[in-house]
Amino acid sequence: MDRIDALRAQLTTAADPARAPAMRAYMRGQFDFLGVAAPARRKAAGPWIQSQDAAGADGWLELANALWRQPEREFKYVSVDLQARHAAELPAAALPRLLVTAKSWWDTVDGLAAWVIGGLVRGRRELQTEMDTLAGDGGFWLRRVAILHQLYWKRETDAGRLFRYCSANAADPEFFIRKAIGWALREYAYTDAEAVRGFVASAALSPLSRREALKRIQ
């Protein structure tokens, strides 16, 4: 039994197939599920993820991509968790841009943005120029990644970059961009509420972005 088959056996045991239709419906019918709730998935996959610690960067990336190719969505969540565990150890060339654009939806994109790409860039600040490129990309999922990659950096956040990305994308009518702008600003407001208030007051944000940004500080 190879490693992916071993994980599949564990997830299948943890699955409640009766949950799968509702999980699929929540994702607008786009993806198949085994029916494993998030807590059960983490419990089932956690030991498997830990058992891959010795695989090294090449091994982790090979596994991450193999997981992404599995048809059920839960495997992509495990892929995100595996990469997030080792984000600080991955090489700069591992920036998982291709995974962002494969079977994209908010559930995988946000995990990649905040925990994988964010973790990778946090340890290798030279990669922020790549985020600058993504912030102006034609694909809105990649722009969402750029906006959200500093989501949990707190005082390490490059506020100038955050505000610049938000301004550059503020006029985009795409819901997932407007929501990302508000979310990123709201999270940074826990660190510097006055800076966020000042930016929101001067920027031409959509009502959705503005409302989300100020939700916790008004």
Question: Could you tell me what each predicted segment is?
Answer:
Residues 1-218:
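Alpha-helical scaffold domains
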